[in-house]
Amino acid sequence: MYQLFPYQQNLVNQARLRLAKKSKGVLLVSPAGSGKSIVIAEIARLATLKGNRVMFTVHRQELINQITQTFQKNNVDMRLVTVMTVGKIANRLGKLPKPSLIITDETHHSKAKTYQKIYDYYFDVPRLGFTATPWRLNGQGFQDVYDSMIEGQPVSWLIANKYLAPYKYFSVKLVDNSKLKKSGSGDFTNKSIDDAIGKTVFGDVVKTWKNKANGQKTIIYAHDIEYSKRVVEAFKNAGINAAHCDSKTGKSERNKIMSDFKSGKLKILSNVDLISEGFDVPDCSCVIMLRPTESLVLFIQQAMRCMRYQPNKKATIIDHVVNYQRFGMPDTPRKWDLKGWKKKKKGHKNDAPPIKTCPHCWAVVPVQCKVCPECGKEIKYDADGIQEDKTAKIEKVGEFKIVTDYEKNKWARKNSEDVEKVEDLYKIAKARGYKPGWAYMNAKRLGMLK
């Protein structure tokens, strides 16, 4: 059986309490990598322990074995559990044993007609839904599926308490955003992404990886198969073991690729619409985003795929398509609501704090930084091509003072990554003339604060 962390046990307790109060549907929100499957397995175990039947719905066949193994490891009575794809359940309504509880993982998909067909048929059965992002491109909420919502600990807390890995975020732009066009679904079309990326020098992708994440186990997210394969070829030509995988890859070949990646035989795994949900490789420490998107769900799932916690691990996120300008960072505070959000003509609301890229090392940093916390070099503003989110609300910040004789000050020259103690971050802040908040922010980002 699993030993739940306190924050996971709290989710279990809150969910059971809501169900005991006759809630028809409870939506549980917890960040990617926070161990939602373990929470689900514990709720299923406690339900079957009382003789209740559980129906667990998945939207992809590949996830069935994974959740089944998780349930079995947690001593869930599988005789009382139905684990199937939503399509198969919808086609077997009336033939399957009636459940006492319906559990849906990745429930941001649950507005689809197939899910609604199941929920309507079992209208008197309470349901639990799990997601990291209760958000849809069309702005629709989930109040017609769930009547209450429980939020777990945020990403920033999970990093600070060593349940998620701290990260570095770099953005070396390889896309012309002015050429991106949306489809009826609300996300960018593949054709417009082709135009926006243009004649990408794939060697630049490899060069950036070598500079920022050399040797790290890396997942690449591409927008189409041809592009993904060309990126893989560029890595191979550089002598780096790499492979491409997508939904059309044969099952046996796909299993071998996944196995080789998990074992370390492959350093680079590039994919198209395959590795976002339910794929767990804790020692993957880097992701490369080559697919621009308007989907917050997709951004979070892809950006945080490398942030599974391991001792001394520092994740690296390389964003070649400036998705951060649309969504902020993985640990940007977000306001979730069952009612959804009001869609705007020029994209969705971005509550992210203003951020920009350092022109020297391409680290994404708060807009008020005048000295990069990653490379220690002075940052000038837009005149030097800084990528700044001008749609974000600018919060009032104090003036930063640049330390005179910068090159002579050993603490001013140090990077935040080079120190291990919180007090050393405060020394760097003092040497550079920063306010104490800079040290606190970096201490949280680096996982030094509990």
Residue ranges and their predicted role:
Residues H109-Y169:
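Post-DEXD/H (motif II) to motif III coupling segment of the RecA-like Helicase ATP-binding lobe
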Residues N65-Q69, K229-R230, I240-V272:
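Conserved helicase ATPase core of P-loop NTP-dependent helicases/translocases
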Residues I64-K98:
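Inter-Walker segment of RecA-like/P-loop motor cores
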Residues M149-I219:
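Conserved interdomain linker/interface between the two RecA-like ATPase lobes of SF2 helicase motors
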Residues M1-L27:
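Conserved pre-motif I regulatory segment
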Residues P99, I268-N271, E277-P292, A315-D319:
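A short beta-strand element within the Helicase C-terminal
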Residues C306-D331:
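Conserved segment of the helicase C-terminal RecA-like domain
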Residues K22-I43:
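Walker A/P-loop
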